[in-house]
Regions:
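Bacterial N-terminal signal peptides
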Residues: 5-15
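Sec/Tat signal peptide C-region and signal peptidase I cleavage site
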Residues: 17-21
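Histidine-/acidic-rich catalytic cores in large beta-rich domains
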Residues: 22-353
Length: 353
């Protein structure tokens, strides 16, 4: 009898815990073949200045609040990148336009780099130095920089010193985007938004407003290879002998005739597209993680999902209260977006443990 009451008490406590859980996402697709690990992201939805971890039911299971001063108004919406470090079970996050921070499970944190323009993406080297993007800077400013572990800038790269004009990289059917970039002039000229490191030590640097990403030799800063023709490129990530990336392709020259054709692209080693996944079914993917099972974990403006290399959706969770098929409706979906950073709500999510 005593065991019955113990079990009943445990069951009631579990039900109350579930009932009181804060839910960020609603899960619409799940599959026995999916990666069942939890998901971490900077909270750009609720208005709370924090990093959160959610389970695959979309419920918050851990959170960490940014200290006062790290987030200024809606700066959190300016490219809050995140990485998970499995060996230390910690998170490295960007407080956009403030710093790159390592956050531990016990709530302690360490600032790894500080810069008033840091955002989007970063790479932490073994010696503690940090390579990071400076996404919204104007022509002539550093688009990427490295700070050593003491906070001193030891390397930088300016797009305009190596790439003289954007127009030679344009010419797609997506005239509306190219027109918007041109109208800004020198403001937000290159829009650095992605970083990865090749096995040979060279850097892969992504420039959205060039619709291209570049392999750069770090000692000289010289561009040794160009990967062009990927409209509004986001998150070019090494995959097999090539890359997986998100593009923002479309047709049309203004809002009235623009048709979204955005997709996840798989390329070969030369950047030639071999496959397009989810074409026309998403709006602005800004996070792609290659998972240990060979699938892709994708973050769009309203959704986190796992897809296999053929584009089959194995897991899909959407911001609570949002239509799960809304993004396939293209720009007509934008007025219906809700959340702190609408319409570009989610930035990047990653799998944890």
């Amino acid at each position: 009898m005593r065991m019955f009451w113990v079990f009943l008490s445990f069951l009631v406590a579990s039900l109350l815990s579930t009932a009181n859980a804060e839910q960020i996402f609603t899960t619409h697709v799940s599959n026995s073949a999916m990666d069942t690990r939890s998901i971490a992201l900077v909270d750009t939805v609720t208005g709370k200045d924090r990093v959160i971890e959610v389970n695959t039911n979309g419920e918050v299971i851990w959170s960490w609040s940014f200290p006062p001063g790290m987030i200024n108004g809606n700066s959190i919406c300016m490219g809050a990148g995140i990485q998970y470090k499995p060996l230390s079970d910690s998170f490295i996050v960007v407080a956009p336009h403030h710093s790159v921070i390592e956050v531990r499970r016990d709530g302690s944190h360490k600032v790894l780099a500080t810069d008033p323009e840091v955002d989007h993406d970063f790479h932490v080297f073994d010696d503690g130095s940090v390579l990071f993007a400076r996404g919204f800077v104007d022509k002539g400013d550093d688009n990427f920089a490295i700070h050593n572990k003491h906070g001193k800038k030891i390397w930088s790269w300016k797009a305009d010193e190596h790439l003289k004009t954007r127009q030679e990289y344009w010419g797609s059917s997506c005239k509306i985007r190219e027109k918007n970039w041109k109208n800004k002039g020198h403001r937000d000229w290159a829009h650095a938004n992605g970083i990865s490191i090749k096995d040979n030590g060279n850097y892969i640097l992504s420039l959205r407003n060039f619709s291209a990403f570049f392999e750069v030799e770090p000692n000289s800063g010289r561009v040794v290879k160009e990967y062009t023709g990927h409209i509004g490129v986001h998150e070019p990530t090494p995959y097999k002998d090539g890359f997986v990336l998100a593009d923002r392709d479309c047709t049309g020259s203004n809002k009235s005739n623009a048709v979204e054709k955005q997709s996840i692209r798989i390329t070969d080693s030369e950047g030639v597209v071999k496959n397009r996944l989810l074409e026309g079914k998403l709006l602005l993917a800004r996070g792609i993680e290659v998972l240990p099972n060979g699938n892709f974990f994708v973050t769009t403006i309203s959704t986190v999902m796992e897809i296999d290399p053929q584009g089959t959706v194995l897991f899909k969770a959407v911001i609570k209260g949002q239509d799960p098929d809304m993004e396939s409706k293209g720009r007509d979906a934008l007025p219906k977006m809700t959340g702190r950073c609408k319409w570009k709500n989610l930035y990047k999510a990653v799998k944890t443990n």
